[in-house]
């Protein structure tokens, strides 16, 4: 593994005072742990037709999507007062392909087909995942808010203040396509193109639409992943209960998400609270200059205009 990594193009992020390094492997940038997970999954992961992937670019609503999916598939065992989400961080409830291959394989052996989360580009997914007709849920978000959220997440991980980490430099790197799991537009475009060929196995969810009116999206998600709500459940308000349980306000207020650690056994563990910054859209307006806005709008039109996805 180390021999492969040594040969790859690399970039140390200037806005993070060179404390974070990305490696380019097959046209996508990743930090070392995700890169190792990608290579390992290419070699060892075998998809099952019952697998469901929850795919996203980082900071696009991943935590929320994982919480919703987990609450949906476990609602027969737990309600909103007994759910493991009350004591367990969402990222620890659903395995990540980049990091939890052994757990995923164990689940498959035991016929426990829980969703599998991933930040991989579509073409970076193991071949079996792309050829076995697994269902794929893809959540996407306004690119401007993604940049702001990504910036804060990384600078807090490496323990830099806003003053120490220039946002302008983060913005410029992102626009060059240099970001974790970037380029961002290639990430979205890859899943979108694949959905044109196999629309029946893809569900696209827009973060902003979900925030505005979550119930229809949650119902659509449950139908798609094979756990539809019954008319009786809908009448009883089960969907609304799940929406409340998985809301930013609820999850961010839980002790586990205020003081716990994600993957505490690892050298690069992350504070759970860093996954819960604001949970709203439009925060980019507090950071972007008019020039930045014009630049990013032009970039979105050039790179993603053909998709028809609204990312501004």
Curated annotation (Swiss-Prot):
It is an enzyme of class 2 (transferase). One of its GO terms (cellular component) is cytoplasm. It comes from Flaveria chlorifolia (Clasping yellowtops). Monomer. Its EC number is 2.8.2.25. Sulfotransferase that utilizes 3'-phospho-5'-adenylyl sulfate (PAPS) as sulfonate donor to catalyze the sulfate conjugation of rhamnetin > isorhamnetin > quercetin > patuletin > kaempferol >ombuin > tamarixetin, but not quercertagetin, gossypetin or myricetin. O-sulfonation of position 3 of flavonol. May play a role in auxin transport. This is Flavonol 3-sulfotransferase. It holds the Pfam family Sulfotransfer_1. It is found in: Cytoplasm. The N-terminus is blocked. Belongs to the sulfotransferase 1 family.
């Amino acid at each position: 593994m180390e021999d492969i990594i040594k040969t790859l193009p690399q970039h140390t992020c200037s806005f993070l005072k060179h404390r974070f390094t990305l490696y380019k492997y097959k046209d996508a940038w990743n930090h070392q742990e995700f890169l190792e997970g990608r290579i390992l999954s290419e070699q060892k992961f075998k998809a099952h037709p019952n697998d469901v992937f929850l795919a996203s670019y980082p900071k696009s609503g991943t935590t929320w999507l994982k919480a919703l999916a987990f609450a949906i598939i476990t609602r027969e065992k737990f309600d909103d007062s007994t759910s493991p989400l009350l004591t367990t961080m969402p990222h620890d409830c659903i395995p990540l392909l980049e990091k939890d291959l052994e757990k995923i394989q164990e689940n498959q052996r035991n016929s426990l087909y829980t969703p599998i989360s991933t930040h991989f580009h579509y073409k970076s997914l193991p071949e079996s995942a792309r050829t076995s007709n697994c269902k794929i849920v893809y959540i996407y978000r306004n690119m401007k808010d993604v940049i702001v959220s990504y910036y804060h997440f990384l600078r807090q991980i490496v323990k830099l203040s806003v003053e120490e980490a220039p946002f302008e430099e983060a913005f410029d790197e992102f626009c060059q396509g240099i970001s974790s799991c970037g380029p961002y537009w290639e990430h979205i475009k890859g899943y979108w193109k694949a959905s044109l060929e196999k629309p029946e196995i893809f569900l696209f969810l827009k973060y902003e639409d979900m925030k505005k009116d979550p119930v229809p999206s949650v119902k659509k998600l449950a139908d798609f992943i094979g756990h539809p709500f019954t008319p009786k459940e809908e009448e009883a308000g089960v969907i609304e209960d799940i929406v409340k349980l998985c809301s930013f306000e609820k999850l961010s207020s839980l002790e586990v998400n205020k003081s716990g650690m994600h993957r505490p056994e690892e050298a690069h563990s992350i504070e759970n609270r860093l996954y819960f910054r604001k949970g709203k859209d439009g925060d980019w307006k507090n950071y972007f200059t008019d020039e930045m806005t014009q630049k990013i709008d032009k970039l979105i039109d050039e790179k993603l205009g053909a998709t028809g996805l609204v990312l501004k």
